[in-house]
């Protein structure tokens, strides 16, 4: 019984010692991140699609902080370019990708050809494809960014990019863009003057 207690005590002592060493090392060898990179990364849409030429949003944020162009993110669009220009103190540029007149496209899986290999699921950076191994897959069109990274890995070519028609149901309404002001609260004197005139 005493040998078990000695072994448990020795393991606890070693765990405490290694924990203290790791704690000290994490403080002593801490790598400071550039705060501008974190701010740029927060503005980017985090689709990790690679259309900018970088493997994800964080590497692109680091490249922008080092002087790369701010107009390479198609999912972010012009709004992201303007936010980045404001943050970086530069003039907003037009998108490097010709998005004028282009209809947004989303992936569509022809389910009769799908073999359930899950290669498209692994390639999708935003988890817009659902399905399981040896089961049919489908695309959640509201989540799809149209990056077409899922098309190339498909061994049966059952994925195609189809245009998403803009309707009143699919339009991205920006309800906060137009401020709603209650006139009676905005100008309380006008209500009392109307009452006095009557």
Curated annotation (Swiss-Prot):
It is found in: Cell inner membrane. Coiled coil: none annotated. [4Fe-4S] cluster 2 binds at residues 114, 117, 120, 154. Binds 3 [4Fe-4S] clusters. Its cofactor is [4Fe-4S] cluster. [4Fe-4S] cluster 3 binds at residues 124, 144, 147, 150. Keywords: 4Fe-4S, Cell inner membrane, Cell membrane, Electron transport, Iron, Iron-sulfur, Membrane, Metal-binding, Repeat, Translocase, Transport. It is an enzyme of class 7 (translocase). PROSITE patterns: 4FE4S (PS51656), 4FE4S_FER_1 (PS00198), 4FE4S_FER_2 (PS51379). Residues 32-90 form the 4Fe-4S domain. Residues 1-26 are annotated as: Hydrophobic. HAMAP family: RsxB_RnfB. This is Ion-translocating oxidoreductase complex subunit B. The gene is rnfB.
């Amino acid at each position: 019984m005493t040998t078990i207690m000695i072994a448990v005590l020795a393991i606890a002592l070693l765990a405490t010692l290694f924990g203290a060493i790791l704690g000290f090392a994490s403080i002593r060898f801490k790598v400071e991140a550039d705060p501008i990179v974190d701010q740029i990364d927060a503005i980017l849409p985090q689709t990790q699609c690679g259309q900018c030429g970088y493997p994800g949003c964080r590497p692109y944020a680091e490249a922008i902080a080092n002087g790369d162009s701010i107009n390479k993110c198609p999912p972010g669009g012009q709004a992201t370019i303007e936010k980045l220009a404001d943050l970086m103190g530069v003039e907003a540029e037009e998108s490097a990708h010709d998005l004028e007149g282009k209809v947004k496209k989303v992936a569509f899986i022809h389910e009769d050809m799908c073999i359930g290999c899950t290669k498209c699921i692994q390639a999708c950076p935003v988890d817009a494809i659902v399905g399981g191994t040896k089961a049919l897959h489908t695309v959640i069109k509201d989540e799809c960014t149209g990056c077409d990274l899922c098309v190339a890995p498909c061994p049966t070519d059952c994925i195609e990019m189809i245009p998403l028609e803009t309707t009143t149901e699919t339009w991205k309404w920006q309800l906060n863009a137009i401020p709603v002001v209650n006139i009676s609260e905005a100008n309380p004197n006008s209500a009392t003057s109307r009452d006095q005139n009557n």
